[in-house]
Amino acid sequence: GYYQSYLLVKETIKQILEGLPAGVAFDRYHQDRHFELFEPCVQANIIAPADLMGYRNHPVYIRGSRHTPLPERAVRDAMRTLCELMKEEENAIVRAILGHFVFVYIHPYMDGNGRTARFIMNSMLVTGGYDWVIIPTERREEYMRALEIASVENDITKFCEFIATLLK
């Protein structure tokens, strides 16, 4: 499903470059990206299609993290607010980093939040004229630590610095 989601991201990037505002693209396609990630599981009858429709309806916990994502009853409003933030923010790097961080902070789905957030970040970066960022396997712990600090200590600085090192 990762490849199908990647193809959707490429199509989204094309639409943004052709004039669709990036924040509107985020609002329009973030759920589709998530669905595409898990489409092979639906085809294999591992997941019911209904399980991928909309946001999560249950609590979710992140293994190894002290951050507890928002309660399921708050997800819809939080995502609506994130969509508005993405529409209003003009700076591509700010949109990319905040979009990624706030998305994983909310954790709107039961699974696939990190992968979806990285697709969001990259679509915002690429359409802003920056390179696609890949989190190297050997830096995954640093990435997770930076997200943990941002989520638990309300300090996004380390996460911003981490992403900046990947942009160089």
Question: What is the predicted function of each stretch?
Answer:
Residues 1-168:
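FIC/Doc superfamily catalytic core
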